[in-house]
Amino acid sequence: MGRKPCCSKEGMNRGAWASMEDKILVTYIKTHGEGKWRSLPKRAGLKRCGKSCRLRWLNYLRPGIKRGNISEDEEDLIIRLHNLLGNRWSLIAGRLPGRTDNEIKNYWNTNLGRRVHDQSHQHCRPNPTITSTKPADAPPANANTVATMPVRTKAARCTRAFFSDDLSDQKEVAANNDGLDNKKEEFDAVGSIGPLLQENVGNAVGEDTNIDMAVSLDSLLLFDSFQVDDGINLQSMAALLDSEDQWF
C-alpha cells in the first residue's frame, strides 16, 4: 500500500500563485502555525494542494528568506558541502542561513554543477605527448657519449705529392754538406801531392824555391769549378800556387 495522496487533484488551481493566495496562506500560518499541510488548504479556503502550500511557504513566503543572487562565498561553501554531503539539499540549506534547499538545488543544477564538472574534467585530462621527430638510432646529445664514439675514417686515393718548404730546406742543407765533403776530399788530395809539386816547380824555375803548400780549406772553397784530375798539368798547378802567394 502506497502513501495516500494529500488531495484528489480535481478542481485545484495550478500554475503561478496569485498575490491573494499568498496573503491567505501567510495569514493562516501566522494564526495557526506551520504543519498539518494535508488539511491546511481546506481549512484556509485555498484551492491548492497541501504540498504546493508547504513549498510556497518554505521557499517564498516564510520570514528570514534571503533574496538576491548567491554570492561567491556562498558558492564556495555550496561546492565544499556538496563534495561532503552529495545531493542532500536540505542539509546543505541548513548551513546557509536564508537559503532554501529548493533554491540551492536549482542553482546547482543550472550553474555550479556544470562549472565544477568542467573544471574537474580539465584537471583530469592528460597532457598531449609530443612525438619526437628524431630517428630511433640517433645517439643522445651528450658530450661524454660523443667523446667515446669511434671515429671512422674514409679511405682516399692520393693523386699528388706536396713537399713543404722545410723538406726543401733540408734537401738544400744536405746538398751543401755533400759539397763541403767533396771539397774537403779535394783539399786532402792536394795536400798529399804537395811535396811532389814543390819539387817539380823548383826544378822548372831553376832555383831553390820554398813554396808553402799549406793551403787553407776556405781558399779552396772559393774555386767552385775546381776538380781534381788524375792527369793534372804541373805547369797549371805551379801557376795556381803563384796566385796563392800573391793572395797571402
From Swiss-Prot:
Residues in the DNA-binding region annotation: 37-61, 89-112
Gene (name only): MYB1
Domain HTH myb-type residue range list: 9-61, 62-116
Alphabetical list of InterPro entries matching this protein: Homeodomain-like_sf (IPR009057), Myb_dom (IPR017930), Myb_TF_plants (IPR015495), SANT/Myb (IPR001005)
Stretches for region Disordered: 118-144
GO cellular component, one term: nucleus
Compartment list: Nucleus
Name recorded for this polypeptide: Transcription factor MYB1
GO MF, any single term: DNA binding
Job description of the protein: Transcription activator involved in the spatiotemporal regulation of flavonoid biosynthesis specifically in the corms of Montbretia. Activates the promoters of enzymes involved in the biosynthesis of the flavonol kaempferol and the flavonol-glycoside kaempferol-rhamnoside.
Organism field: Crocosmia x crocosmiiflora
Keywords of this entry: Activator, DNA-binding, Nucleus, Repeat, Transcription, Transcription regulation
Keyword rRNA processing: no
